Amino acid sequence: VFKMVDGNGKYHAVRCFHREKKGRGKNYKLICEALAKVSSPYLLPVKYLGKELYVDSEEYPVLLMDWAEGMTLDKYLRKIIDDEHALWNLISNFRQLSIWLLSQPFAHGDLKPDNIIVKNDGSLVLVDYDGMFVPAMHGQIARELGSQDFRNPLRTESGFDKDIDNFPIISILLSLELLIANKDYLSQFG
């Protein structure tokens, strides 16, 4: 992922794909269409540009989304681990994100600390929509299963629906709450 600035001074994240993956274009179009109808501070506008990058006469797709300024959840945790008030605020913000996400007809599909950005004001935003499920994908198999450390160990490719975020939400929330009880868990297990 590259950070770039447009002519208006706005920052974007640009993800370049150097290999063709079957169904990627179709699925990203479905994701972009679904997310275009959602107004939420937890999501970033995203566009899939099918033939945007030219290398040696080959055309490659790119993904363009707004840049989320902040720190990944894991880096932010290491920064605030000694500040119980900041940790409680983070837990509260993650609960709110979780309640919102669980009420949606879609799922992120790869919830993990690296895909949650803590913005400078403490609010949270999700990034990396590769594994996302949207209703138009009903009946498809998962393109990816999410990170092993944060997915349901029983999850399979056929388990691809709006409920795939349930397990990682519980896992992350419990982990955050355990840090209130013992901040040393972060250095021991984190």
Language-model features: locations:
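Conserved activation segment of eukaryotic-like protein kinases, specifically the C-terminal portion
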Residues: 140-154
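Conserved end of the kinase activation segment
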Residues: 154-163
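Catalytic-loop of the protein kinase fold
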Residues: 98, 102-119
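Conserved structural core of kinase catalytic domains
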Residues: 42-88, 139
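Helical subdomain adjoining the active site within ATP-dependent kinase catalytic cores
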Residues: 178-190
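ATP-binding glycine-rich loop module of kinase domains
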Residues: 1-44, 56
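Activation of the activation-loop gatekeeper triad in protein kinase-fold domains
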Residues: 128-133
